[in-house]
Amino acid sequence: MDAHSVNLVNNDKPVVVCCGDSITHGHIGYDWVSSLREKDNSKIYINAGVNADLTWNLNQRVDDIIKHNPDYVTILIGTNDAIGSQNIKHIQDYYVETKGLPRLPHIDWYSSELEKFIKTVKFQTHAQIIISTLPWLGEQSDAKIITVVKAHNDVIRSLSEKYNLTLIDLFKHFEDLIDSNDSVPYTTTEWRRLRGLRAVFYIMYLDGAGIELERNID
């Protein structure tokens, strides 16, 4: 059930639109939106996650979200912004070419686009907005990408406070777990093991975030 395929005519259930990228879409990883839908039939859960989207892309389809007149909007977006903001040419070129970006990703652009999306939803709907920090990327706390993710999460926390949003700190769900993994990253057998564990972690921790989300939309 995505943002383009839902018929809400004559349906008085509260509408929850879950906005984001592949983490929300759930096609590759754990589909936490479907899990919420299965656990709670008192609301309509609409999956507005699109694989590989950046926040700019989310703004291009904001009208599809608003038209559902949501009671709740969840936001989990920025992982691709964080990855693309690294000064690595082939990664940046990939996002520009495949996602039709008008410029190279940058944290300042992320902040601007995220605030734009929040303001649009806040002022054009009556929805309660629930925003989440980004999850970890990789398994090592000293990896360069973690510094990038933390900077993007600072943006999320700041905007959450500025606009009085409900914050779910998904990053913290991963933090202790990742810190406890002192194995050598990405060796062949270890990488296979971590791939399997990651699937379990996503089920455990994203489902945990889903439960936390459920509490916030009662």
Which sequence ranges carry the predicted segments?
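N-terminal carbohydrate-binding/catalytic regions of secreted carbohydrate-active enzymes
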Residues: W32
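Membrane/wall-proximal cationic-aromatic binding patches
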Residues: M1-V16
